[in-house]
């Protein structure tokens, strides 16, 4: 397998757009799968994504667009998946081309709903992609700041760290610093959990809890994350590293965080449906909450923050009541 070969971006949202910008800082050209032909036409005409990160300009002559997933896969060696996890299976149903000989990078910060599996496991289980040919791209990195070329740090995790290093070099730039890891499962689970905890932080903000309590919440969240990771995927990891703690902090505190925004709306009294409609963007943590809750039924890890968010979102228990109970459990 020649790496990276031809790279394809699989998705058309803000994070996909930011990753395309990162790739084109190093690559001569890329392939790009978007499901909507009208978006592709507008992109070519305007020179930017018409719906997301509209300030990022592209030389469209360096991009081969297509709404046909099979054509893109056939013409590519490395596939970077950036579709929201709730829609991944729908996209993949259109795929007739085998991908087991491709290199897969998942930048999806979610779990496949209903299956309750992390994305790397999904590609191995459903499509026969060997684990050593799957990498995870994660870290405290908002798409909006990549667009502004603000210094950001990303981690590429793969069981084969030599392959991870190849992509770390190709994705790095003057504004993107990269590191490598082999903790694929741990990083994927932490990427899901930090969205859940960002919703919790948003709910508390909507309820007018202050910065002092937010600090306590996040401190307890990283402990809860560590307990879960050590139970589900035991490994000698340091959760203080930026790909774990850093990603949790930026997602929990930043105004760019859609999960925090979603939680804030819930804390202010919005229903789940009304918050989702008004946001017009996917808050992955909503789906991740239910998935982790189901997974934890097999492990019985003490996760009071996850339980509180689940009760608020899915059991429709008052945020005020749930968060008050949560405050009594913190130290």
Enumerate the language-model features and the residues they cover.
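NAD(P)+-binding Rossmann beta1-loop-alpha1 motif at the extreme N-terminus of oxidoreductases
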Residues: 1-56, 63-67
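A short helix-to-beta-strand connector/capping loop
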Residues: 56-65, 129-133, 174-176, 301
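Rossmann-like NAD(P)(H) cofactor-binding subdomain of soluble oxidoreductases
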Residues: 66-74, 78-151, 167-169
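Internal alpha-helical scaffold of NAD(P)-dependent oxidoreductase catalytic cores
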Residues: 87, 98, 126-133, 151-238
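NAD(P)-dependent Rossmann-like dehydrogenase/reductase catalytic/cofactor-binding core
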Residues: 194, 201-205, 230-331
């Amino acid at each position: 397998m020649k790496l990276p070969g031809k790279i394809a971006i699989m998705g058309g949202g803000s994070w996909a757009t930011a990753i395309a910008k990162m790739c084109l800082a190093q690559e001569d050209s890329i392939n790009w799968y978007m499901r909507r032909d009208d978006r592709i036409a507008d992109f070519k005409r305007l020179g930017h994504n018409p719906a997301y990160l509209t300030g990022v300009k592209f030389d469209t002559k360096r991009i081969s667009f297509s709404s046909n997933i099979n054509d893109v896969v056939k013409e590519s060696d490395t596939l970077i998946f950036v579709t929201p996890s709730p829609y991944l299976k729908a996209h993949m149903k259109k795929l007739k081309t085998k991908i087991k000989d491709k290199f897969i990078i998942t930048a999806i910060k979610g779990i496949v709903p209903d299956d309750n599996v992390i994305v790397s496991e999904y590609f191995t289980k459903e499509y026969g992609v060997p684990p050593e040919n799957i990498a995870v791209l994660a870290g405290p990195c908002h798409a909006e700041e990549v667009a502004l070329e603000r210094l950001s740090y990303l981690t590429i995790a793969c069981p084969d760290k030599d392959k991870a290093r190849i992509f770390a070099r190709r994705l790095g730039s003057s504004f993107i610093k990269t590191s490598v890891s082999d903790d694929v499962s741990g990083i994927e689970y932490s990427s899901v959990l930090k969205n859940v905890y960002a919703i919790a932080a948003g709910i508390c903000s909507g309820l007018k809890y202050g910065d002092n309590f937010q600090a306590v919440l996040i401190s307890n969240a990283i402990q809860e994350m560590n307990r879960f990771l050590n139970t589900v995927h035991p490994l000698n990891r340091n959760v203080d590293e930026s790909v774990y703690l850093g990603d949790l902090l930026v997602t929990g505190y930043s105004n760019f965080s859609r999960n925090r925004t979603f939680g804030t709306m819930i804390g202010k009294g919005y229903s789940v449906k009304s918050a989702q409609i008004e946001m017009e963007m996917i808050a992955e943590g909503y789906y991740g909450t239910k998935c982790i809750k189901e997974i934890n039924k097999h492990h019985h890890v003490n996760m009071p923050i996850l339980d509180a968010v689940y009760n608020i979102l899915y059991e429709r228990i008052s945020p005020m009541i749930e968060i008050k109970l949560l405050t009594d459990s913190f130290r």
